[in-house]
Amino acid sequence: MIKTTLLFFATALCEIIGCFLPWLWLKRNASIWLLLPAGISLALFVWLLTLHPAASGRVYAAYGGVYVCTALIWLRVVDGVKLSLYDWTGALIALCGMLIIVAGWGRT
């Protein structure tokens, strides 16, 4: 379970970086060269999703919970926005959903 969760967090980080770099290019007039590491990051994101031993839809559903938590960490660390009680509550609910889905992988 810990290995799966850590893999999901790495996957989410790759997805967020892969989307953030083009955002910088489009919104902040950053270098177009940021699209190259963005593409690599998104390719790594896709590859990491294939490393889970469950059906793709189940992996995507469980991953969504970790993505929510990772995006909120990004919001706090990179964007500098203080998280609200609603952010924390939503993250906890999403993470619990992920844990329930992953716990059932070997039982279905």
From Swiss-Prot:
Residues 27-30, 82-84 are cytoplasmic. It is a multi-pass membrane protein. Residues 1-5, 52-60, 106-108 are periplasmic. The chain crosses the membrane at residues 6-26, 31-51, 61-81, 85-105. GO terms for cellular component: plasma membrane. It is found in: Cell inner membrane. Disulfide bonds: none annotated. It holds the Pfam family UPF0060. It comes from the Bacteria. Keywords: Cell inner membrane, Cell membrane, Membrane, Transmembrane, Transmembrane helix. Its main location: membrane. Belongs to the UPF0060 family. This is UPF0060 membrane protein YnfA.
